[in-house]
Design a protein with these regions (language model features):
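Conserved Switch II/interswitch segment of TRAFAC-class P-loop GTPases
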Residues: 275-280, 291-309
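Well-ordered beta-strand positions
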Residues: 270, 293-296, 324
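Extracytoplasmic
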Residues: 10, 28-30, 155, 171, ...
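Phosphate-binding/switch loop-helix module in NTP-utilizing enzymes
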Residues: 241-281, 288
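Membrane-interface helix-start motif
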Residues: 40-54
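Nucleotide-state-sensitive switch-loop elements of NTP-binding domains
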Residues: 215-244
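Non-transmembrane alpha-helical coiled-coil
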Residues: 1-43, 82
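Short boundary/hinge segments that flank catalytic cores
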Residues: 52-176, 181-186, 194-198, 202-209, ...
Length: 359
């Protein structure tokens, strides 16, 4: 027992000595830590900064939207303005037919006022349905460009075509012919699209004997004139396509077609011809080699530049004279609006004094 007491006393003495050493060491060390300021909790979070984050998000989203729009425009291979048409094809833009955004306006212009019996068979003759509309002014501007396209005399034979189907060439052909007839000229419209004829539906006529009938065998002048119909409302002469033949290109390229055009030129002031798309069929290219000039209809945002370039090359290779391009369903920019500003204030001149004289 005494031995355990002595051992515990030894442990106690060692602990006392160690504590004394620690106290001496602590007193010898300088304490340079002090409280500078008592911490105060902030009124709002330090992070994230909401205003800064929203501002950065708006800037980044705007940059992304602009970049995406530029990228999509870079990928777009179509033409959408008269400037693009002229710069890429190196051809003059004769007119820009505006797109109708309002469905109410579209319905009014396409259907028109009709007659007393509510007949709307001429619904696609936009230049008649609303003579003061921007559409009618566009076609009057086109008429002026056509009449001034050749020095010395106005063209006798004119082909209106397009690169692809459904670009509006038939409606453009009909309205162009009507606008020429409004000057008092004797105008004939010929439906040479014997693959998908439409002129007879535009004028509400039956498509019985027509162009294909005359080209199937040699025809005399009196036979040709007998098949031509007259539309009193538009003061326009119409030759329908006739029955759809199995070989339209062969008929178009025949000697009968050349002879027929000579007969028509001798009897009419202007002959306006509607043909199939030239990038799809050879019919239009064959006709282009026989007429005084060609007008190419291009729907904005539809036909690729490569197809347009090919169409222009096809016409150039045969020596066709391209008067220019009509941009259909165009969104009007500054240059396109200039067309209508100019044509609007000259409309009375062409509808008044010019109508008294046959061109």
């Amino acid at each position: 027992l005494e031995q355990k007491i002595d051992t515990n006393k030894g442990f106690l003495e060692n602990l006392i000595k160690q504590q004394s050493s620690n106290d001496i060491a602590a007193r010898g060390t300088d304490n340079n830590i002090s409280v500078a300021e008592i911490a105060v909790p902030p009124d709002e979070p330090v992070s994230p900064r909401r205003v800064l984050s929203v501002g950065l998000a708006l800037i980044l989203s705007t940059m992304f939207g602009v970049g995406l729009a530029l990228f999509l425009e870079y990928l777009d291979d179509t033409v959408r303005s008269t400037d693009e048409v002229e710069n890429y094809l190196q051809l003059p833009a004769l007119a820009a037919i505006p797109i109708i955004d309002s469905m109410a306006k579209r319905r009014l212009l396409l259907v028109g006022p009709g007659n007393e019996d509510g007949d709307h068979t001429k619904s696609e003759l936009l230049i008649q349905s609303d003579p003061r509309s921007s559409l009618a002014e566009a076609y009057r501007q086109l008429r002026t460009s056509i009449l001034l396209s050749t020095a010395g005399r106005a063209p006798k034979t004119l082909l209106v075509t397009s690169s692809l189907p459904s670009e509006g060439k038939t409606i453009t052909t009909a309205n162009t012919a009507v606008s020429l007839a409004q000057t008092g000229a004797k105008v004939l419209i010929v439906d040479a699209d014997m693959r998908r004829p439409r002129i007879h539906t535009v004028f509400g006529m039956e498509n019985g004997s027509g162009l294909s009938s005359l080209l199937s065998s040699p025809a005399k002048e009196e036979d040709v004139l007998e098949l031509i119909k007259f539309d009193t409302s538009s003061n326009l002469y119409v030759m329908t396509s006739g029955p759809v033949p199995p070989n339209p290109a062969e008929l178009i390229g025949s000697e009968q077609m050349t002879s027929l055009l000579k007969i028509l030129q001798n009897n009419f002031t202007h002959v306006v011809i509607d043909s199939p798309p030239i990038a799809s069929f050879t019919d239009g290219v064959l006709i282009a080699s026989m007429v005084d000039g060609v007008i190419l209809v291009v729907q904005a945002g539809r036909c690729s530049r490569q197809v347009l370039k090919r169409s222009r090359q096809l016409l150039t290779d045969i020596g066709a004279r391209i008067f220019g391009v009509i941009l259909n369903q165009a969104k009007l920019g500054a240059k396109e609006n200039h067309y209508y500003y100019e044509s609007y204030y000259h409309a009375d001149h062409y509808n008044g004094s010019a109508e008294k004289n046959e061109i």
